[in-house]
């Protein structure tokens, strides 16, 4: 909800916001300014006897304003954007805010109603556009020669990588500084087309124009605005309906007809949703709101200040992944280098005189043998953030398990050995034994491996093969460590390889999910890859796919900063057999430290 202020008071607040800090991860609202008064400004703006009176359009007079703050009259315009992909539209929004780059701002997310996980939003969004009326009554801006940071802000910059202090700085001062504010109103229709839509860009543009003309030109249809939607169709209906975007982590229904949507939003003016456009226009002068701002990064004014590099890195991480500000401390604690164990340099690349392990699996009479690396993988007292099955060796015929872990232990964590640290999974319950191919050949034990202690996390893993009758059975063993001085934040979650339905046999189905009707999954778009590593997908593999790859799913099961709130750790795992492939399903948990005399009555049920 915006600040509902009369024109004169809104002008005072707008002028008072110049030089204040702002958190760009959130929407543009005057009430979100850090402080929002002269005394809380981050910039040293000259105030004194030479202050002047500013007269704004509409006869509004604001006394005692610094001469460094200038006022300019605005304009009214209708603007229709091009049909643009996600990142280009995000870049266009940033340019309007005097920002560089393609990372979505809070304004962009609010207008198109995206989540903070922009990589997933970008993967499932085909095109974006908007058409609207923008009324700028006036703008107030700071003279560029007066951009000088106050000394107390420089002194507040942490000199080392201190996640708690960095999170506190961002919470108090924000990420950027306001140097310009445009006041007025806007009435805009935003179009969002999902990846599965077959509609061509020119057709989407045409339909958007038709809907916008009905709203702005004819003004003959009463529209609901705010957070309500107008669902698009071939007949350009104005029926309100929420778009359900495909979510890879959900098994919810997917409607192919809901492949694009129009959203009507207003800023400024009367907030009566039943007002027609022409009626709303008459109220903007009396109740203006901020429609745009310009910013400069706080870090651009910290040259030579000790610790400015750490702050810049923390702000970049925060704006890229947008964790909840109240959880930024824990998020930053986890932004350590991640690596796989064993490291690639330890994998044998040359010819081997004999297999390192005699353990092997065979899935049919004529099929090749899949050798199993039974060497334990232990990362010590460091949290694991991901797992994968991998085919090692020159012939890619040796199955191994790899663990992704943080390079060091976050300072907020303490790990101690679990009393039951080595969990040996050798269930004799044959309901968990599932064939990969032929019934009389190798099986996989799909029983979940997890600790009885909710505060335990995985710190080691091992594959193990045992003979049961005439067939070998593959088992997964895990090692656990206990998190000291922490509490479980929410219920643990299970993830599995994308594209595999969670039904690995009757018993596995019963313990994993309730029976549900078969749902048509959405088409899987290409992921937005922001990893600049030389080999972001793992070590080089042969140009020809290994023969045994048809029996093993080598997808990486990881959770990083892009999975909000960004500090998940592995607390369990299980093997699955899906469509004739051995795969992994991983359990993740969130822990937060118990600070001081804090008493946790019960874990949050999320």
Swiss-Prot record:
Keywords: Hypersensitive response, Immunity, Innate immunity, Plant defense. SMART domains: MACPF. The keyword Ion transport does not apply. Residues 1-332 form the MACPF domain. GO terms for biological process: plant-type hypersensitive response; regulation of salicylic acid mediated signaling pathway. InterPro entries: CAD1/NSL1-like, MACPF. It holds the Pfam family MACPF. Negatively controls the salicylic acid (SA)-mediated pathway of programmed cell death in plant immunity. This is MACPF domain-containing protein At4g24290. It comes from Arabidopsis thaliana (Mouse-ear cress).
């Amino acid at each position: 909800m915006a600040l509902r202020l009369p024109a004169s008071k809104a002008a005072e607040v707008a002028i008072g916001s110049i030089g204040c800090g702002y958190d760009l991860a959130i929407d543009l609202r005057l009430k979100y300014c850090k402080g929002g008064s002269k005394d809380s400004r981050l910039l040293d703006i000259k105030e004194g006897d030479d202050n002047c009176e500013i007269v704004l359009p509409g006869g509004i007079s604001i006394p005692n304003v610094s001469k460094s703050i200038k006022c300019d009259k605005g304009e009214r315009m209708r603007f229709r954007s091009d049909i643009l992909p996600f990142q280009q539209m995000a870049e266009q929004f940033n340019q309007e805010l005097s920002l560089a780059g393609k990372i979505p701002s809070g304004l962009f997310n609010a207008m198109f109603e995206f989540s903070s996980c922009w990589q997933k939003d970008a993967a499932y969004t085909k095109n974006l556009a908007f058409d609207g009326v923008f009324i700028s009554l006036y703008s107030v801006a700071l003279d560029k020669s007066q951009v000088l940071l106050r000394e107390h802000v420089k002194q507040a910059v942490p000199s080392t990588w201190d996640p708690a202090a960095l999170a506190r700085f961002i919470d108090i001062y924000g990420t950027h500084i306001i140097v310009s504010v445009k006041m007025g109103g806007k009435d805009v229709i935003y179009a969002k087309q999902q990846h599965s839509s077959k509609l061509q860009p020119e057709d989407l543009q045409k339909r958007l124009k038709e809907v916008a003309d009905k709203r702005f030109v004819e003004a003959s249809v009463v529209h609901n605005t705010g957070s309500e939607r107008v669902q698009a169709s071939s007949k350009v209906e104005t029926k309100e309906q929420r778009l359900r975007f495909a979510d890879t982590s959900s098994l919810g229904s997917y409607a192919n007809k809901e492949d694009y949507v129009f959203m009507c939003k207003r800023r400024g003016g009367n907030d009566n949703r039943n007002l027609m456009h022409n009626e709303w226009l008459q109220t903007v002068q009396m109740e203006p709101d901020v429609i745009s701002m310009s910013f400069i990064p706080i870090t651009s004014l910290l040259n030579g200040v000790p610790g400015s590099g750490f702050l810049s890195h923390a702000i970049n991480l925060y704006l890229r992944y947008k964790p909840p500000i109240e959880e930024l401390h824990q998020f930053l604690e986890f932004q350590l280098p991640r690596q796989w164990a064993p490291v690639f340099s330890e994998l044998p690349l040359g010819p081997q005189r004999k297999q390192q392990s005699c353990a092997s699996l065979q899935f049919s009479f004529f099929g090749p043998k899949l050798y199993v690396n039974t060497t334990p993988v232990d990362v010590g007292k460091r949290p694991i953030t991901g797992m994968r099955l991998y085919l090692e060796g020159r012939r890619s015929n040796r199955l191994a398990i790899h663990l992704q872990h943080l390079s060091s232990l976050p300072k907020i964590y303490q790990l101690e050995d679990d009393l039951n640290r080595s969990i040996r999974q050798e269930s004799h319950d044959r309901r968990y034994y599932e064939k990969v191919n032929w019934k009389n050949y190798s099986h996989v034990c799909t029983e979940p491996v997890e600790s009885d202690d909710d505060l335990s996390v995985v710190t080691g893993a091992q594959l193990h093969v045992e003979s049961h009758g005439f067939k070998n059975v593959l088992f997964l063993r895990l090692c656990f460590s206990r998190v000291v001085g922490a509490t479980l934040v929410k219920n643990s979650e299970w993830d599995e390889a994308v594209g595999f339905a969670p039904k690995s046999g009757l018993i596995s189905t019963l313990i994993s999910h309730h029976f549900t009707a078969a749902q048509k999954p959405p088409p899987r778009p290409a992921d937005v890859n922001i990893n600049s590593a030389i080999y972001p997908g793992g070590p080089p593999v042969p140009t020809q796919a290994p023969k045994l790859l048809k029996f093993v799913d080598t997808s990486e099961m990881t959770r990083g900063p892009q999975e909000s709130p960004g500090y998940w750790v592995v607390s369990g795992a299980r093997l699955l057999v899906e469509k004739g492939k051995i795969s992994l399903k991983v359990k993740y948990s969130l822990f937060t430290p118990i600070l001081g005399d804090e008493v946790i009555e019960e874990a949050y049920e999320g």
